[in-house]
Amino acid sequence: ESSYDLVIDNQSLSYGILEVQKNVPLIEIIHHPITKDLYYDLQFSKGIIQKISKWRWFSFLKMQKKVAIQLKVISTPSDNSKKDIAKDFGVAKKNISVIHNGIDYLSFTPLEDIQRVPNQIITTASADVPLKGLDFTLYAIARLKEDYPELRLVIIGEPRPEGHTERLIKKLQIEKNIFYRSSLTRDEIAVEYAKSNIAIVSSLYEGFGFPVGEAMSCAIPLIATNVASIPEITGPFAELIPAESSKAIESAIRNIFANPESYQVKADAGRIHIIENFNWQKIALSYEELIYKTIEEFEC
C-alpha cells in the first residue's frame, strides 16, 4: 500500500508511470508534446547525418506516445497544448485538463526608478535550439543596426560556445550589438526588462511561454509570434506577428520606436491582464480542484 495520497509526474512519460497509476492517484503534467521539438529540429537540420542524429535522440517519443494514451489524468498549461497532445499522442481530450502556469507578478514588476537604456531590446533564449526562433530576431537586428547603430539586444540565456547562434552573430557582424545575461534571479531579470524598451518572443512554438507572461508583467511593450499558446497568454496586449519572419520583427520594432507612448499604454494594460488571469492564487485553486477530483475518482 502506498504512503502517498497523490503522485504528480512532470512529463517523464515512462513505462514505470503506468505502474504508479495502478496503485496511486496520478496526475501527469505534459507541457507540450515533444513531437513539436522534433519537427522543428528536423526542419532546421542540415544534411542527412544531422537528421538521423535527431531521430535517434528523439527515439524516446515512441515510449511517450504509448504511455500518454493510457494515462487517465493529464494537466497541461494551454488549450493549444491540449489540442496538440490529443492530436500527436492520441490522448482523449476528456482526460486532459488545462491549468495555466502562474506568473510571479510581484517579482516581474515595473521598476519606475530604473531608466530605460536608449535603443535596448530584450529577448529570452533558454536553449540554443530552432524552436526558440532566435535567428529571426538576429537577422532583424542586423538590418536595424544600419539605422540604429547603438541598438542593443540583451539575450537572457547562456550562449553555447561555438554553437549555431554564436556563429550566426559573427556572420551577421552584430557582435557589438548583442549582450548575454545568464544565471540571473527573477528580480535581476526584472531589472533587465526595466532597462529595455521592447521585449521580443520570436518562438516557433510554445507550450506556454513564461517569457511572454513575464515581459507583460513587467509592463514592457511586447512583440511576440502569433503561434501555439502565445496568443492565449497575450490577449490583445502584444504586437503579434507571423513566425519565421525577421521582416515582421523589424517592422514591429520600428513601429514601437516611432510611437512608444501608445505601445506603453497597451503594455500597462497587459500587466493588469496578467495579474488578473495568471496569478498563482487562481492557478493554485485550479490545481486543488483537480487534485481532489483525481483522488476521489481513484477511490471509487
Place the predicted regions along the sequence by residue.
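Membrane-proximal helix-turn-helix segments that form the acceptor-binding/catalytic region
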Residues: 51-74
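Carbohydrate-associated surface elements
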Residues: 80, 102
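Conserved donor-binding/catalytic core segment of Leloir-type glycosyltransferases
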Residues: 114-132, 138-141
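Nucleotide-activated donor-binding/catalytic signature segment of Leloir-type glycosyltransferases, i.e.
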Residues: 165-187
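Short alpha-helical donor nucleotide-sugar binding micro-motif in glycosyltransferases
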Residues: 183-184, 191-196
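Aromatic "clamp/platform" in nucleotide-sugar-dependent glycosyltransferases that forms part
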Residues: 204
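Short hydrophobic beta-strand element within catalytic cores of glycosyltransferases
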Residues: 221-224
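Conserved acidic donor-binding segment of nucleotide-sugar-dependent glycosyltransferases
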Residues: 239-246, 255-261
